[in-house]
Design a protein with these regions (language model features):
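A sequence/structural signal for flexible, mid-protein segments enriched
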Residues: 37-283
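C-terminal motif of bacterial Sec signal peptides marking the signal peptidase cleavage site
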Residues: 32-35
Length: 283
């Protein structure tokens, strides 16, 4: 069964992926440094048609996308759901019923508050789904650049994202890079091994000399998105990285038996225009 996440503010167009495999074992060290994923469809290891709830509370608004996946032997597209009742409450006493817009999308203009734990309830056709997530504090992007790095005899272009770890608290991060408004690379990161210090995430972009769709072109617009997420959201997306190895779906993020996730997060963005002449070479 396949589904892809929506192209709204959370922008988690996260798909089932294969790891970026290098041609030589010497490249494994670079792979371990980057730990980023390409944008490929999620191939769910389930057969029945299930509801899919993709929802978020952010520093700008609340929203959800609700659909129903199709059986694996059904060639039709997934169906958007327009008759759900979606309510998000906070432990600060807030309550918002999201209003249906179109294409299975529900929204409310309320913003998330750091430290507040939010609960979403979704009622649709006699089924009930719930999930909780705690809003995190605002992250900051220090810098982003593209570098060239030689591995064995070949050159690779790599995205380098730097940001300070938020002090005096446990932190989990989600990073998503868009290329010309389409998902390009993503990664998750925690701070358990080096809390409170500058963090760096590397993204495998492409091997120089390749001609495939991954290759960046002069003038490509990159949008770098950095999210602070809670542990339950981190665990969900980290488990997605393990799908090929375990042969299972991501760990459940909702009660009630639906697919998908609910995330309360703070998002910051930075724009970057790719120019080959500006790519810096590093040892």
């Amino acid at each position: 069964m396949k589904y892809s996440l929506p192209h709204y503010h959370l922008s988690f167009i996260i798909y089932h992926f294969s790891l970026f495999i290098f041609h030589y074992s010497l490249f494994i060290s670079l792979l371990l440094l980057t730990s980023c994923e390409k944008e490929i469809e999620i191939d769910y290891h389930t057969v029945p048609s299930l509801y899919v709830v993709e929802a978020s509370v952010s520093n700008t608004r609340m929203e959800a996308r609700i659909s129903r996946s199709q059986n694996m032997d059904d060639n039709s597209t997934k169906s958007d759901i327009s008759n759900a009742v979606v309510v998000i409450t906070g432990d600060d006493g807030s309550s918002n019923q999201l209003k249906y817009q179109s294409n299975g999308r529900y929204t409310a203009n309320s913003k998330g508050v750091p430290g507040v734990t939010y609960t979403i309830t979704v009622d649709v056709n006699d089924e009930h789904f719930t999930s909780t997530s705690t809003m995190q504090n605002k992250p900051t992007i220090s810098s982003f650049r593209v570098i060239r790095k030689k591995i064995a005899t070949e050159w690779f272009q790599i995205g380098e994202l730097n940001f300070p770890d938020l002090p005096n608290e446990d932190n989990w991060y989600f990073m998503h890079i868009y290329r010309n408004d389409l998902g390009y690379r993503w990664a998750v990161l925690d701070d358990r091994n080096d809390p409170g210090n500058e963090r760096q995430q590397l993204f495998n972009f492409f091997r120089e000399g390749d001609t495939g769709s991954d290759v960046l072109r002069d003038g490509d617009n990159l949008r770098i998105e950095l999210y602070t997420i809670d542990k339950s959201t981190y665990d969900y997306f980290f488990s997605m990285q393990m799908m090929d190895n375990t042969g299972t779906n991501p760990i459940p993020n909702f009660t009630g038996g639906c697919l998908g996730y609910f995330s309360a997060h703070w998002l910051v963005t930075q724009n970057f225009v790719y120019r080959a002449e500006n790519v810096e070479e590093e040892e």
